[in-house]
């Protein structure tokens, strides 16, 4: 899932990787080509939160290993909870005094991961 139209690569260094994924696997984008083309560069970053929500929608769960207080990863975390997907947060995030979001998301239904069994148990069919 990319945050640009299918014909664009960001960052440019990923052009070959993106072409390989498009040819051999599946490349997904919700970004409208014509609207993207006429927007100033500064506004194009606004498509990345949509990408994060799409990534959440295509999965059973999102695992957060590390994210700062203003990280775009938190957009995907919010989307996962809103979409009824599992949200897993590694225990190390809870032990970081520089961030407050892990406790907030845990109150909203995120699963604190102390070991891999926490993930496997949560993904078992009911």
What are these regions (language model features)?
Residues 1-126:
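Glycine-biased, small-residue-rich flexible motifs in mid-sequence functional cores and linkers
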């Amino acid at each position: 899932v990319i945050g640009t139209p299918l014909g664009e690569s960001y960052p440019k260094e990923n052009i070959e990787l993106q072409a390989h994924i498009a040819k051999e696997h599946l490349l997904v984008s919700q970004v409208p080509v014509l609207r993207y083309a006429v927007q100033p560069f500064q506004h194009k970053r606004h498509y990345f939160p949509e990408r994060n929500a799409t990534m959440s929608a295509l999965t059973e769960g999102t695992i957060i290993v590390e994210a700062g207080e203003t990280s775009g990863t938190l957009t995907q975390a919010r989307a996962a909870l809103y979409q009824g997907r599992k949200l897993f947060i590694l225990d190390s995030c809870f032990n970081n005094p520089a961030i407050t979001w892990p406790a907030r998301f845990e109150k909203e239904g995120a699963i604190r991961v102390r070991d891999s069994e926490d993930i496997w148990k949560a993904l078992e069919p009911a």
